[in-house]
């Protein structure tokens, strides 16, 4: 391969790597895994196509043809066609961008570089390292290549050309090489190569054994006393940070802020008996804040025609009477046709009718009284008759209902 061709492949491979790394969702260590999967599938394809289409007959002829087929372009194409699933974007992209490398290995490098994974993924594309190594220079992971992180954690970037090499210790382990017990765990057994860590009592952050009296340090919210961790009552020491309409509820090692009862304005605990003050719509009955029944009042709360009051917790609501429904803000009979043409006085309520009646009679009587005062006997007689008629109307059953409706209001 000429110098210019090698340079082209190097630049082309670098551009491909940058393109793949820039794709959202692709992590650097994942590229090594993609390369490893590709190599695994290629090797499976090589195994599957070994001796393909040769099943007996002229042995000399078969040996000649087989030796040609073994490293033929036909066989390489058959292997490559099955190397990636159609839905595996990363694998197909890697294969597409590295066909030149695959051909170079297939035709020229196989015998001297039989390990395709090492040649392609480690040495050529520089995506992977041997197990127990990490980073651009394939440095040894903490704890050694044989047992990275002492077997109690995961070396960051292990087996790839990426990562920091820092040990991510498993639960219960800690330290730079995961050979210490984490906070909340104690050393149960240890030798030169193995460590067993077990959990402390739940209140201990550091301990020498599993018992509640073997604590060395306590978790937040607990106080160490004679080897035991005692719960701190944040509610009793006023260390809580609850809002004005919440109360403090102590828990093991902490506390909770819980909502006051809806009948309360400020409280010292749960329920209507722990209120500091009663909320609007409630009254204090002994020690409890109870709901005020606004509907049980001499003054009607619902002033609309055919409305009735329904008490609710801390308030009330106005609903239409039976066989009535609210239409256009008013309680109408269920048979009411909202599309029917309305008359001039259809929207006048009973209370408004009473007021109009009073105004009409008032004007008439005032006019008659003025004329009667001038000594006109005819108008005097009419005035007396009008007063008598008006009195008779108000004494009638209809007048009583109208007056009662007016006095009670809407």
From Swiss-Prot:
Keywords: Calcium, Disulfide bond, EGF-like domain, Isomerase, Membrane, Redox-active center, Repeat, Signal, Transmembrane, Transmembrane helix
SMART domains: EGF, EGF_CA, FU
Subcellular location: Membrane
EGF-like domain span: 139-179, 291-332
Top-tier EC class: isomerase
Transmembrane segments: 353-373, 375-395
InterPro entries: DUF3456, ECM_structural_protein, EGF-like_Ca-bd_dom, EGF-like_dom, EGF-type_Asp/Asn_hydroxyl_site, EGF_Ca-bd_CS, Furin_repeat, Growth_fac_rcpt_cys_sf
Disruption phenotype: About half of the knockdown tadpoles exhibit severe defects of either early gastrulation disruption or edema and late embryonic lethality. Some also have tail defects. Surviving tadpoles show more robust seizure behaviors than wild-type in response to pilocarpine treatment.
Sequence motif: CXXC, positions: 32-35, 264-267
GO molecular function, one term: calcium ion binding
Topology of this chain in the membrane: Multi-pass membrane protein
Reaction equations catalysed: Catalyzes the rearrangement of -S-S- bonds in proteins
Cytoplasmic topological domain: 374
EC number: 5.3.4.1
Leader peptide range in chain numbering: 1-29
Disulfide cysteine pairs (residue numbers): 32-35, 141-155, 149-167, 169-178, 264-267, 295-309, 302-318, 320-331
Extracellular side: 30-352, 396-410
UniProt record similarity statement: Belongs to the CRELD family.
Function: Protein disulfide isomerase. Promotes the localization of acetylcholine receptors (AChRs) to the plasma membrane.
Protein name from the UniProt record: Protein disulfide isomerase CRELD1
UniProt source species: Xenopus tropicalis
Gene designation: creld1
């Amino acid at each position: 391969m000429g110098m210019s061709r090698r340079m082209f492949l190097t630049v082309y491979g670098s551009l491909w790597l940058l393109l793949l790394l820039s794709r959202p969702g692709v992590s650097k260590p994942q590229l090594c895994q993609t390369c490893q999967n590709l190599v695994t599938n290629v090797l499976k394809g090589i195994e599957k196509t070994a001796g393909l289409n040769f099943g007996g007959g002229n042995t000399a002829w078969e040996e000649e043809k087989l030796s040609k087929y073994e490293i033929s372009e036909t066989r390489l194409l058959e292997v490559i066609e099955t190397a990636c699933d159609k839905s595996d974007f990363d694998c197909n992209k890697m294969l597409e961008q590295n066909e030149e490398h695959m051909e170079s290995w297939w035709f020229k490098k196989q015998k001297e570089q039989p390990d395709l994974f090492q040649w392609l993924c480690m040495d050529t594309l520089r995506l992977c390292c041997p197990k127990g190594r990490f980073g651009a220079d394939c440095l040894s992971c903490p704890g050694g290549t044989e047992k990275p992180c002492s077997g109690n954690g995961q070396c960051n970037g292990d087996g790839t050309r990426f990562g920091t090499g820092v040990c991510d210790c498993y639960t219960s382990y800690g330290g730079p090489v995961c050979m210490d017990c984490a906070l909340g765990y104690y050393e149960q057994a240890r030798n030169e190569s193995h460590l067993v860590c077990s959990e402390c009592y739940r209140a201990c952050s550091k301990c020498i054994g599993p018992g509640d009296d073997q604590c060395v340090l306590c978790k937040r919210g607990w106080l160490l006393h004679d080897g035991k961790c005692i719960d701190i009552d944040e509610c009793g020491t006023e260390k809580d940070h609850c809002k004005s309409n919440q109360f403090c509820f102590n828990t093991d090692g902490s506390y909770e802020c819980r909502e006051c009862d809806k009948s309360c304005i400020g409280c010292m605990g749960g329920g209507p008996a722990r209120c500091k003050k009663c909320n609007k719509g409630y009254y204090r009955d002994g020690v409890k804040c109870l709901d005020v029944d606004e509907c049980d009042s001499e003054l009607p709360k619902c002033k609309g025609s055919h409305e009735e009051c329904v008490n609710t917790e801390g308030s009330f609501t106005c609903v239409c009477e039976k066989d009535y429904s609210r239409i256009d803000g008013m309680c109408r009979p269920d048979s009411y046709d909202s599309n029917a043409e309305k008359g001039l006085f259809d929207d006048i309520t009973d209370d408004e009718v009473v007021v109009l009646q009073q105004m009409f009679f008032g004007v008439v009587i005032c006019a008659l009284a003025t004329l009667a005062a001038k000594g006109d006997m005819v108008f005097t007689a009419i005035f007396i008759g009008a007063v008598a008629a008006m009195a008779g109307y108000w004494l009638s059953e209809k007048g009583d209902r109208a007056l009662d409706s007016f006095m009670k209001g809407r």
